[in-house]
């Protein structure tokens, strides 16, 4: 399983420098939608990292798909986006058990 990152240039640069190969740089909402759809269809991606603000800008149906996605598991970083979940909540949703208990 691979890690993918979707975001604006300043968000994805660090991931790119860290060696992440599947980096999708976006400039607007249509490019964001296209990148998210591409990642959701790619079965080799296990984790998707996005900024909360970019997720909040997506259409409702696409946000719902991301929130319900088990593979890839979506990790939202930064901001205080609507419906943001902690990493703990995401792992609990994906695995079905709270591993911190």
Swiss-Prot record:
Any Gene Ontology CC annotation: plasma membrane
Topological relation to the membrane, as annotated: Peripheral membrane protein
Compartment(s) of residence: Cell membrane
GO biological process: proton motive force-driven plasma membrane ATP synthesis
Keyword terms of this UniProt record: ATP synthesis, Cell membrane, Hydrogen ion transport, Ion transport, Membrane, Transport
GO MF term set: ATP binding; proton-transporting ATP synthase activity, rotational mechanism; proton-transporting ATPase activity, rotational mechanism
Domain of life: Archaea
Main subcellular location of this protein, as a coarse class: membrane
InterPro entries: ATPase_V1-cplx_f_g_su, ATPase_V1-cplx_fsu_bac/arc, ATPase_V1_fsu_sf
One Pfam family, short name: ATP-synt_F
Protein purpose: Component of the A-type ATP synthase that produces ATP from ADP in the presence of a proton gradient across the membrane.
Assembly and binders: Has multiple subunits with at least A(3), B(3), C, D, E, F, H, I and proteolipid K(x).
Family: Belongs to the V-ATPase F subunit family.
HAMAP family: ATP_synth_F_arch
Identification of the protein by name: A-type ATP synthase subunit F
Annotated source species: Methanosarcina acetivorans (strain ATCC 35395 / DSM 2834 / JCM 12185 / C2A)
Lineage: Archaea, Methanobacteriati, Methanobacteriota, Stenosarchaea group, Methanomicrobia
Gene behind the chain: atpF
């Amino acid at each position: 399983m691979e890690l993918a990152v979707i975001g604006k240039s300043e968000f994805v640069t660090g991931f790119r420098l860290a060696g992440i190969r599947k980096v999708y740089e976006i400039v607007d909402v249509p490019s964001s939608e296209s990148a998210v759809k591409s990642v959701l269809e790619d079965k080799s991606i296990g984790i998707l990292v996005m900024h909360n603000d970019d997720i909040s800008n997506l259409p409702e149906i696409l946000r719902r798909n991301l929130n319900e996605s088990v593979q890839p598991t979506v990790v939202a970083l930064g901001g205080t986006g609507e419906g943001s979940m902690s990493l703990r909540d995401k792992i609990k949703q994906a695995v079905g058990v709270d591993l911190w208990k």
